[in-house]
Amino acid sequence: MAAKDILFDSDARAKLKVGVDKLANAVKVTLGPAGRNVLIDKKFGAPTSTKDGVTVAKEIELEDAFENMGAQMVREVASKTSDVAGDGTTTATVLAQAIYREGLKNVAAGARPIDLKRGIDRAVKEVVAELRSISRNISGKKEIAQVGTISANNDPEIGELIAEAMDKVGKDGVITVEEAKGMDTELKVVEGMQFDRGYLSPYFVTNPETMEAELEEALILIYDKKISNMKELLPILEKSAQSGRPLLIIAEDIEGEALATIVVNKLRGTLKVAAVKAPGFGDRRKAMLEDIAILTGGTVISEEKGYKLENATMAYLGQASRVNIDKDNTTIVEGKGKQEEITARINEIKGQIEKSTSDYDTEKLQERLAKLSGGVAVLNIGASTEVEMKEKKARVEDALHATRAAVQEGIVAGGGVALIRAIKGLERATADNDDQKTGIDIIRRALEEPLRQIVANTGTTDGAVVLEKVRSGEGDYGFNARTEEYENLVDAGVVDPTKVTRSALENAASVASILLTTEAAITDLPEDKADMPAMPPGGMGGMGGMY
């Protein structure tokens, strides 16, 4: 086991503070509409330019191990806030630095760290309650666009696109962000249920121009095994042919004689039919087939449930207004399933999402949820250079996350004003002793810091003057750093999701409290190069040298 280096008391806290300050000072220059960019060197490829706090924080590793521990603790604040709310990472970093700085002063003056922590915790609880009380719900497209615009660093194009996407697929719908092939940024909406399986044979194509199979008022056969024997498929094929409606066959696979017979009958005009493989694999495939069955009002023909393909009747078939199939995807539009069954399935998947502990499983469940809810929106992000594309894509992902947060918990005035107004909640915070009261006052002072930093980044106005003027106002009145005017910020579109502001404060206070109550810090001693064993002279041992 490697030898350790240990620092105690004020020595440990001072070193941690240096690390906290180095990281926070690099991150906080990005705060607000007047925030600056940070250029990050990449060992491979061009440097990355970003105005995203968590991206800056994740790049910082300090040489001194004790300083690095302080930096990593604050990096955790930014990361956790980003994971929970998608935005507010810079605000969280600024708050953590302010709470730790003010707390350290008091610890040095003799305050008990554990009482400071208790005071901080009580203060945060009351501030969060106050934030919730001043929060307002959003639903309109205009309000959603405002949140998206602010979170995308004041890019109205991105805000409008996100609002449009949410309008099309609903607030529970899946919105994915992808890199476009060209320079234009556009929104593409896939209506209905789409899965990534194309036709099994190009002979199923009904529209040679688009190379798509289009089935109107289609019947849908859903089978969870391979079909290789025509005999078991024949009864249901004859019944669907008599109805005169086109048939889509979804099965694990169709091969050999069965596929050849279907294709020949399609070419002769005897059958209107198309066949695709079932989506997904394993248990996920079973679940997706069940989703398709519920959406279309059909039944999954599965021997596990006691159903046999040769005994299938028309009652087992699902129905849809339209099915479009190309070589890669199948889209089922307007399935004829019962709405109450679809709603029950949606609620079941939502329950699974809440219980899921895996990010991958959660993502797949959300995709299934969106397909049942009515569609997937894809934001294709275009830019003139790769560096700009990556930066813009990251901003869109952040803005999308923050917009979802706003829909969940509502919005408050932006620009640091909501935190100033939430100071009122501290009147309800109780303290058992003077040190706890000091902890409450630390939060009172820290809540002003984001506004001070936003103003400082404009480089033209005195933070103390702005703070005093905002304090004297009421409600949503505050300083708009983009126009450098005092106005109603919500009316001006300067808003923050309540969840973002709340998460930033809670995470900052949590990590700053841990740092304040730290009495010792332990790290590995750096290996001294001088103590390393000398390399043996030329050649390899036992081989008398290599030539």
Swiss-Prot record:
Keywords tagged on the record: ATP-binding, Chaperone, Cytoplasm, Isomerase, Nucleotide-binding
Gene source species: Chlorobaculum parvum (strain DSM 263 / NCIMB 8327)
Recorded GO MF terms: ATP binding; ATP-dependent protein folding chaperone; isomerase activity; unfolded protein binding
InterPro entries: Chaperonin_Cpn60_CS (IPR018370), Cpn60/GroEL (IPR001844), Cpn60/GroEL/TCP-1 (IPR002423), GroEL-like_apical_dom_sf (IPR027409), GROEL-like_equatorial_sf (IPR027413), TCP-1-like_intermed_sf (IPR027410)
UniProt subcellular location: Cytoplasm
The protein's name in its UniProt record: Chaperonin GroEL
GO cellular component: cytoplasm
Gene name as annotated: groEL
PANTHER family: 60 KDA HEAT SHOCK PROTEIN, MITOCHONDRIAL (PTHR45633)
Protein's job: Together with its co-chaperonin GroES, plays an essential role in assisting protein folding. The GroEL-GroES system forms a nano-cage that allows encapsulation of the non-native substrate proteins and provides a physical environment optimized to promote and accelerate protein folding.
Quaternary structure (record): Forms a cylinder of 14 subunits composed of two heptameric rings stacked back-to-back. Interacts with the co-chaperonin GroES.
